[in-house]
Every structure is written in C-alpha cells, then in structure tokens.
Amino acid sequence: MKPMYRSRSWRRKYVRTPGGRVVIHFERKKPKIAHCAMCGRPLNGIPRGRPVEMRKLPKTKKRPERPMPHLCPRCMRKVMKEQIRAQLS
C-alpha cells in the first residue's frame, strides 16, 4: 500500500474481482451535506458530491430552483416576510 493511502482521508472500498480475489480500491470521501446559512439545518435537494462529480451535473441538479437556495424553506419564508414587511412600512 502506498504511503499516501495509509491516511484515513481515503475511503477504502473492498471490491471482488472476476478472479475471486478481494482488492481494496481507494476513493476520496464525500463532502458533508449542505446546511442552511441561517439555522444550520441540512438542506434537501443539494447532492453530496466531490467537485469533479458536481461539475458533471446540470445547474438545476446542483441546487433548488427557487429564491435563496442557500436557505432552508422555513428561513427563506422568514426572510421574505421581513423584506415585504420592510417595504410596506
């Protein structure tokens, strides 16, 4: 095993080959799930992927198609209500 693969920043995937041997394939770990910028709640609709994988996805698959995709729906509603109330007053 190469010294670079000894660290746990590489995920170890055990793969059975057609010859019946089990070998280790090393993969980079997936990044953490995206979180809301205000409350920190995990965001739905945003895939966990390394930059190389994310680059291959179309823009609509990378983030929600709505205003303020970096916020969860609850926080987005709060912000929009505050903005509208500020305009009215």
From Swiss-Prot:
InterPro entries in the record, alphabetically?
Ribosomal_eL34, Ribosomal_eL34_C_sf, Ribosomal_eL34_CS, Ribosomal_L34e_arc-type
Q: In this UniProt entry, which cysteines form S-S bonds? A: none
> Region Disordered: what ranges?
45-71
Superkingdom of origin organism? Archaea
* GO BP of this protein: translation
- List cellular component terms (GO): ribonucleoprotein complex; ribosome
**Alphabetic keyword roster:** Ribonucleoprotein, Ribosomal protein
GO MF term set: structural constituent of ribosome
Write down the HAMAP family for this protein, in alphabetical order. Ribosomal_eL34
Family per UniProt? Belongs to the eukaryotic ribosomal protein eL34 family.
Supply the NCBIfam families for this chain: PRK04059.1
Q: How does it assemble?
A: Part of the 50S ribosomal subunit.
Full protein name: Large ribosomal subunit protein eL34
